[in-house]
Amino acid sequence: MSEALETGDPSPPPPIVSENGKTYYYLNSQESQAPNTPSPQEVPPKKMTNLFESGPLVYEDVAADIEAVTERASRRHYENKMVVKNSREMFDNVNILPDGRYYCCLCNRPYKTHATLTAHLRGYHLRNESSCDEPGCNFLSFTDQEKKRHRRTHDKKKKERNSQESMVIHEKIQKAVRRLDYPGEDELRDHLNGSTEVQGTIRTMTKKGKIRYACLKCPHSVFNAYHAARHVEMHNDFPKNCFYCGEIRKGTVDLQVHYMRVHKHEGIRTFKCSVCHLRFTTTILFRDHVECENGCQNPEIRQDIYYGELPEGTIVDDLTQDRLQNFRKRQEIWKTMGQMVEEHRTDVHEEIVGESSVQAGDTTVFDGSRAFIQTPFGLKTALEVKNTSRFCPRSGKRTSDDDLMITNKKRERLEMAPNLHFHQDIIHRLPTSTTTQRQNNAFQNEYLRPPVSYGYDPLIGRYPDFQLMSQSSLPSSSASSSSYDPFATAVYQDSDRNPMQPNDQHICDMNNVGAYETANFGLDNSSDLVVNEATIASNLMVNEVEDEVFEELNKLDFVMPADDGNDNDDDLEEVFNFGNVA
């Protein structure tokens, strides 16, 4: 909104307030006299006859007046026409030059930004002068900042007359007095009033008055009681729940390790499922996702992932790819080594079976692959006995390859012959039962008894002297049927009974095995063959141990007694206990 008025009165009129509440200001307070214009005496003064209100200001109408004003020396002197402008309208109607600069519509001064133009309008064309309120001060301020800055000068207290001299004397005294490195009264008072004790720490005070909390279990120390309490919690073993998964961990340290391994990199997804498009951090989480209830039934998921492979389209980063390649290389190496060991075991087994030359027809011969052997160190499997150390504790030397090969063959023969008398007791004590009878007994009892545990028995304080039961030694209608009877009573031998003592059965020779195939010893021919082989293998091992003992005695120049009726060979055998060697 703009208004134009004509006046000849040199005195500045008061601001005009319109009916709608807008305030209008006069920008010039004096008349400008042009050189060609008549003097004030010649021109009669004009009165303010009309005051009209128009629409938005059109700068083309007053362009000539603005140019005339800018040519004059004083920026505040205008022609007879004075432009009265509203403050809001002045800020809204801003002219922009073609080069992008802003210029004032009153004084035609260019500015680079709209902010600088606004500051110019408020500072020069719309400012309100205010005088200082202090008596005797004629300072005029045009902005609020100038007024506040000037008021601070009156608020400052006046210094005393001797303040400067006192400051100089105080500085000299402070330089002369030696400063002690001890806390002052204020620091000691704060320490006594606001000190806190933390269990598990030692509280000390430094020279500067700070409180130090030292841990009793580690050299860690802090200056904050809260941090000290958090550190002491790390040494406690109280169970704590994980915030993310709810898993219970023992202590804060274990909980932090769980977080670092599981939840730290949850935001970084490296493995992507091709079915549900979920991403996982590690291969364990990814396989757990795939091996869900419906994972094996989903045709879109490759089933080879259950065997260590990743499905097609899986996004894997470089580090994880290198780890997978190294893991697969190790799997190939382990697979190759396993094949070599299996081939070697197959060759040894075929060689032993060929040497035994046992022809039992259609019956199944017990090979002793799962048998337990009684050793001085307890029950051992055939593979553990086979892989014993090559170091000989008697002579302190290592055996040669030829001796080791012979020893391994003899041990393989011994594996095929478990404890003789245990199988004989099982044959004579256990009644003949069929699969149907066993099922009926299980249905009547409605519970299953756990199998016998083989190993150290804490009740008797030693290893029980028995071996696992072979399938061929059980009396059954057909040799091919193999079933486990959970109700079979475990038979323990007496401790004073020699497990390797030969019985009254006929001992067959390895060269005359075929002669006993047609014979009828016991309840089953196949079981008698195994019993005879066990007896032969046990006797061979006893003879070998006797030879080794006599060789050691010969080295010590030990003279055996003469062969007469009063010899003490039996006493010597009891001393060395040849029969208990297994």
From Swiss-Prot:
SMART domains: ZnF_C2H2. InterPro entries: Snail/Krueppel_Znf, Znf_C2H2_type. GO terms for molecular function: DNA-binding transcription factor activity, RNA polymerase II-specific; sequence-specific DNA binding; zinc ion binding. A zinc finger (C2H2-type) spans 102-125, 130-154, 213-235. Keywords: DNA-binding, Metal-binding, Nucleus, Repeat, Zinc, Zinc-finger. One of its GO terms (biological process) is regulation of transcription by RNA polymerase II. The keyword Membrane does not apply. Its main location: nucleus. One of its GO terms (cellular component) is nucleus. Disulfide bonds: none annotated. PROSITE patterns: ZINC_FINGER_C2H2_1, ZINC_FINGER_C2H2_2. The keyword tRNA-binding does not apply. Residues 1-21 are annotated as: Disordered. It is found in: Nucleus. PANTHER family: AT-RICH BINDING PROTEIN-RELATED, ZINC FINGER PROTEIN. This is Heterogeneous nuclear ribonucleoprotein C homolog. The gene is hrpc-1.
